[in-house]
């Protein structure tokens, strides 16, 4: 039985915790602010994040069923950091990610990393040696419900774009980061045939041949592979993508926005297969790895280069850029 979601956290409490030294940057669009916080320095902001995450995920057909979506990875000395977009006009959170740098990953007794994804995926020795030190894990990406409808909220148009401004800045602050590791999420409510088409298409064009990361219990498609192969007959990604988009629309659906965004972010994205997240509304999680320097040039210019142009001094450091940005307040 689902618990009742907590009431909104008082905006004055939130503002009192979103202090200048936690601000990462301004967004390229909509004049919003990006902050990095943790449970340790911003406990009330974390509660509001948990509230908004649970609302957004329940609406889509997932969620924890608890009063707020917070788990053990959000707390503790080695907790995930929370990257959020803040609307200073409405004093509210637009969306966010949580992340953990590879250098901070801790290993269990079997040599596997203790991550939010560890119950679904097994990490190879090659991944742990050659990728982990240069990787940041991203998870729990969300856009607040009020910002998911572009018809009712003009800032919704750039909500995802704003979040990626934050991710772009991370690659400047942490120059050792070469890869983003995360998950694309699809929900049980999504039409099965459409899901199978999307997953087949992704595997065809982005499949990881090295088994760097593998799902412990891989999701089995309900549509036969021969039937899907007969639909996606092109070698070219763009040509096959047009087929996918047409077929999904014929079913009365759209490709989920985040899935669409990720597959159009980098031509060399690696796909690690799909597993069911049984503790999170049985959502279907597809592991992906994106090389930062192989993202499309347009994306690099918008989300990474714009941050360097605004703050060239950030290139001299690996963390704590706020100490430079706000030095006049020290």
Predicted feature locations:
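A short helix-loop-beta-strand connector motif used in the catalytic cores of GNAT acetyltransferases and
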Residues: 74-84, 107, 269-270, 280-286, ...
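Short, flexible loop/turn elements at secondary-structure junctions
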Residues: 38-41, 87-89, 98-103, 140-142, ...
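Long, low-complexity, charge-dense
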Residues: 1-3, 9, 26, 319-330
């Amino acid at each position: 039985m689902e618990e009742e979601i907590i009431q909104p956290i008082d905006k004055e409490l939130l503002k009192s915790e979103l202090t200048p030294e936690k601000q990462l940057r301004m967004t390229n669009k909509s004049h919003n602010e990006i902050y990095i916080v943790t449970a340790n320095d911003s406990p009330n902001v974390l509660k509001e994040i948990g509230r908004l995450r649970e609302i957004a995920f329940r609406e889509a057909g997932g969620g924890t069923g608890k009063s707020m979506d917070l788990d053990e990875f959000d707390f503790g000395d080695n907790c995930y950091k929370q990257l959020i977009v803040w609307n200073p006009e409405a004093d509210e959170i637009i969306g966010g990610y949580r992340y953990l740098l590879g250098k901070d990953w801790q290993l269990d007794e079997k040599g596997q990393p203790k991550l939010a994804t560890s119950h679904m995926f097994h990490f190879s020795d090659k991944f742990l040696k050659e990728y982990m030190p240069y990787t940041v894990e991203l998870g729990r990406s969300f856009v607040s419900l009020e910002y998911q409808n572009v018809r009712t909220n003009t800032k919704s148009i750039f909500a995802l774009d704003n979040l990626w401004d934050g991710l772009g800045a991370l690659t400047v602050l942490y120059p050792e980061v070469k890869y983003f590791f995360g998950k694309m999420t699809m929900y049980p409510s999504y039409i099965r045939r459409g899901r199978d088409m999307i997953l087949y298409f992704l595997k065809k064009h982005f499949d990881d041949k090295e088994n760097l990361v593998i799902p412990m219990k891989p999701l089995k498609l309900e549509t036969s592979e021969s039937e899907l192969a007969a639909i996606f007959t092109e070698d070219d990604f763009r040509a096959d993508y047009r087929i996918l988009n047409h077929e999904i629309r014929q079913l009365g659906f759209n490709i989920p926005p985040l899935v669409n965004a990720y597959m159009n972010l980098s031509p060399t994205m690696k796909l690690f297969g799909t597993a069911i997240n049984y503790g999170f509304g049985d959502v279907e999680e597809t592991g992906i790895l994106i090389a930062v320097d192989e993202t499309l040039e347009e994306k690099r210019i918008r989300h990474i280069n714009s941050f360097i142009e605004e703050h060239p001094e950030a290139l001299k450091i690996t963390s704590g850029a706020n100490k430079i940005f706000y030095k006049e307040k020290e």
